[in-house]
């Protein structure tokens, strides 16, 4: 693909065995890497596992000098707080491979798919207004991040 000028991107939660990343890393131009929660305990509460493996894998890819877009889903009432934004900024500034931070606002586009799969999810959050998204963006930029809305 590279010989033909085709770039390869991998979207990942980062929750994978390191050997998987080691195999795909040489074939990948950029990783779209989700960073959901900075606090390990909150990550375990909402996701079911802490974020230590995810952080390890992010650092591994950065050490491979891979281009990384740190994608941060922001959910009102869950991770739209100063502590999380400060954590994102610290993480992004500590890894040269991070090209930029992409904020992704909470949405409900996957709700119908859950129903089709027979999954029931009681989680609900407010869908943020554009003004709120801009405030998040401003907050991250004030912390020194090259942040964008996704």
Spans of features found by a protein language model:
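Conserved AdoMet/S-adenosylmethionine-binding subsite of the radical SAM
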Residues: 1-109, 115
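Short aromatic/hydrophobic-glycine micro-motifs
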Residues: 6, 119, 145-146
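Short glycine/proline- and charge-enriched loop/turn segments
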Residues: 115-123
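C-terminal catalytic and target-recognition region of SAM-dependent MTase-like enzymes
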Residues: 125-131
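A cross-taxonomic marker for long C-terminal extensions/tails that follow the last structured domain
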Residues: 131-150
């Amino acid at each position: 693909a590279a010989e033909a000028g085709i770039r390869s991107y991998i979207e990942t939660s980062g929750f994978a065995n390191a050997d998987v990343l080691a195999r795909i890393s040489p074939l990948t131009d950029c990783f779209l890497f989700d960073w959901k929660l900075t606090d390990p305990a909150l990550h375990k509460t909402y996701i079911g596992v802490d974020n230590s493996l995810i952080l390890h894998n992010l650092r591994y890819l950065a050490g491979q000098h891979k281009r990384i877009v740190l994608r941060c889903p922001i959910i009102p009432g869950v991770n739209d707080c100063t502590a999380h934004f400060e954590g994102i900024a610290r993480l992004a500034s500590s890894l040269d491979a991070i090209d930029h931070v992409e904020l992704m606002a909470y949405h409900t586009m996957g709700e119908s798919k859950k129903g089709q799969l027979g999954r029931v999810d009681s989680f609900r959050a407010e869908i943020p207004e554009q003004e709120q998204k801009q405030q998040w963006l401003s907050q991250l930029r004030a912390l020194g991040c090259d942040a964008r809305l996704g």
